[in-house]
Every structure is written in C-alpha cells, then in structure tokens.
Amino acid sequence: MQTAARRSFDYDMPLIQTPTSACQIRQAWAKVADTPDRETADRLKDEIKALLKEKNAVLVAHYYVDPLIQDLALETGGCVGDSLEMARFGAEHEAGTLVVAGVRFMGESAKILCPEKTVLMPDLEAECSLDLGCPEEAFSAFCDQHPDRTVVVYANTSAAVKARADWVVTSSVALEIVSYLKSRGEKLIWGPDRHLGDYICRETGADMLLWQGSCIVHNEFKGQELAALKAEHPEAVVLVHPESPQSVIELGDVVGSTSKLLKAAVSRPEKKFIVATDLGILHEMQKQAPDKQFIAAPTAGNGGSCKSCAFCPWMAMNSLGGIKYALTSGRNEILLDRKLGEAAKLPLQRMLDFAAGLKKKDVFNGMGPA
C-alpha cells in the first residue's frame, strides 16, 4: 500500500452530492414483486424460454438479481456475472436482443456497446444509488474545474456521465487501470463511489479527487459489528466488496469485485466465509461451494438504518414477470441518442480493451485518451 499524494477527503466537495433519498428507496421497495410460487415460477420460466428462442434473445443477469432469474439465464445459454462480464458477454453474443436483468446503467452499457441490438430490461425504473447520486450536469461542472485531470468513472453511472469521462472502470479492473494511469503521471478525478475511490487511492498512491457518492447496500456495512462477528468466527474468511467503508475493507481477507469474491469462496480451502456485499451473490456461492458456510456481514448496529439490509431494492425489482412482459410487448427498451452512445462508447471500450490485454498479459503502450 502506498500513500496518496492527494487524498479524496482533503477536498471540499460540491454540495450537490447528497445521499439517495429515503423516498426513492421506499419507492423501489414498493415495486418489488412477490416471489412466485413454484408452479407459477415454472410456468413463467417455460414461457420465457420459448420467447427467448422466438425473439433471438439472450438473458444477461447480474449476481444480485433473484436466484430464479440467475438460474434461468444459465439454463438458456445466457450469462450471470458482474458488470464487466455482462458487458463483455453482451458485446460478443450473436443474439439480436439482449434482456438485461440488473439496473439501468447495465442496460445502457449494453446498448452503448451494441447499438445495433435491441436491449430490453424487466423494469426501466431499476436504478442505482451511485448513478442517481452523480447527475451529469453537476459532475461535468466539477470536472470542468479541474481540466488538467483525467476523468475516470465507475461503470455504475449514466451514459451521459460516461460520455464525459476518459475511462470507465469496473471493480474488476479499477486497481489495474488506475495503477496504469499513475505510472503515466496522470492526476485523476474519480466518480462516483467514494469508498471504492478511497480504497484505490490508498492502494495505488494515485493523486485522486473523489466524487462523494456511495452504494446504499455497501455503505451500510459496519466495521465494529463486523469485527465482533469475526471474533465469533475466527476461522472464517472475510470477503469484502470495495464499495464498503474503509473500516469494513480493513477487516477483509479478500477485497474485490463480486467475481473475485465468488472465486475466493470456491477456491479457498476454508469452510466458513463472512460476506460483505449484496446477499444476492450467496446463491451462486452456495451453488458452487455447497459444502461451505456463508454468513452475511452485519448492516445493523450503531448508526445502522438498514435501508437495504444487504439487498439492493432496484436489483430486486427484476422479476420473471418483468422479463416476460419485456419480451412479449417489446417495451422497456433502452434507447440512447446516437451521438451520446458513440461518446460513451470510447471510454467503455477503452476499459474492455485494457481488460482483454490484462487477460492476455499484454504490455500496454499509448492507450491513454486521445
């Protein structure tokens, strides 16, 4: 770990950066459908399977959505993954229609990368607190105040914010990309997640100014309560997503993206794990490691509000009924202005090219923004 030349919290950030309102969160939870009974779920799955074939469509799902949807995606030749894996899969798959089960920025990313494809979502109102907390006009004005800095934004942002950026990153490749930019002597603006940005700042020593957004799920994990839980289970491996507060990250044995945490849960020899991320990931962890025990990290305790209780309300808005509706009606389609999509594709494609190079262990030269 290195010491950053300029830390995020040394800077007086814009007042526009307010937490996602309790009203928005309540509205999201109010739209979450009841879990269907077994007979109804089986009927819906059969109908969706037929519709996917009929429409030349494929289901692309995030680890945080309903386990019924995750299983259906895999059963039909689709994808279950983190946001990087979803973007890569959608761009490479031959299907003419992508049904993206996740939150809106994921559907937008699919459309940005595949403008010729139809991109549908179970519910277009499935937002993300990070996206909501980073409005394009305010973020762009902040960037304009620091024209000498390279703008790096997390994938959890709107197409308009991506279009303002030089690089888009996911938690899977953020450390590597920021390290690369630091090696080029670049100073950065990072948005919107302050916890992930601060973690990267501390790990790389990069000169970063951070937008002060946060994820309502990961922001609720509590360091003091996690330490107490860890003391109760000293043999457990603590898995932490870096969108969590620093006090939680410091207790992690493994810190990384959902895919990295899943890989650790499956590959490590230990039999007990404490998991500090959205509990939707536990379904795939338990499937791939049925002999292991997974314990949810605490979100309650001192100062706890449990707005999410480790479940994203917008991810929970995805339903089998919503998928069927999108496929039968053709509605809930992601539509983007062509010029906006082209501008947003440049930093997003830059990340995918970088990630592909990492996979091949290539050496990168001259990949900075033009």
UniProtKB/Swiss-Prot annotation:
Subcellular location: Cytoplasm
Coiled coil residues, start to end: none
Principal place of residence: cytoplasm
Binding annotation for [4Fe-4S] cluster: 128, 215, 312
Pfam family of the protein (one): NadA
Domain of life (superkingdom): Bacteria
GO biological process: 'de novo' NAD biosynthetic process from L-aspartate
This enzyme's EC code(s): 2.5.1.72
Pathway given in the UniProt record: Cofactor biosynthesis; NAD(+) biosynthesis; quinolinate from iminoaspartate: step 1/1
Keywords associated with the record: 4Fe-4S, Cytoplasm, Iron, Iron-sulfur, Metal-binding, Pyridine nucleotide biosynthesis, Transferase
GO molecular function, one term: quinolinate synthetase A activity
Residues noted as binding iminosuccinate in the record, renumbered to the chain: 62, 83, 154-156, 171, 241-243, 258
Statement: the UniProt record of this protein carries the keyword Metal-binding: yes
GO-annotated cellular components: cytosol
Catalytic activity: iminosuccinate + dihydroxyacetone phosphate = quinolinate + phosphate + 2 H2O + H(+)
Cofactor notes: Binds 1 [4Fe-4S] cluster per subunit.
Cofactor names: [4Fe-4S] cluster
SUPFAM superfamilies tied to this protein: NadA-like
Purpose: Catalyzes the condensation of iminoaspartate with dihydroxyacetone phosphate to form quinolinate.
HAMAP family with a match to the protein in the record: NadA_type1
Record NCBIfam families: nadA, PRK09375.1-1, PRK09375.1-2
Family: Belongs to the quinolinate synthase family. Type 1 subfamily.
Name of protein: Quinolinate synthase
Species this chain originates from: Neisseria meningitidis serogroup B (strain ATCC BAA-335 / MC58)
Gene that specifies this protein: nadA
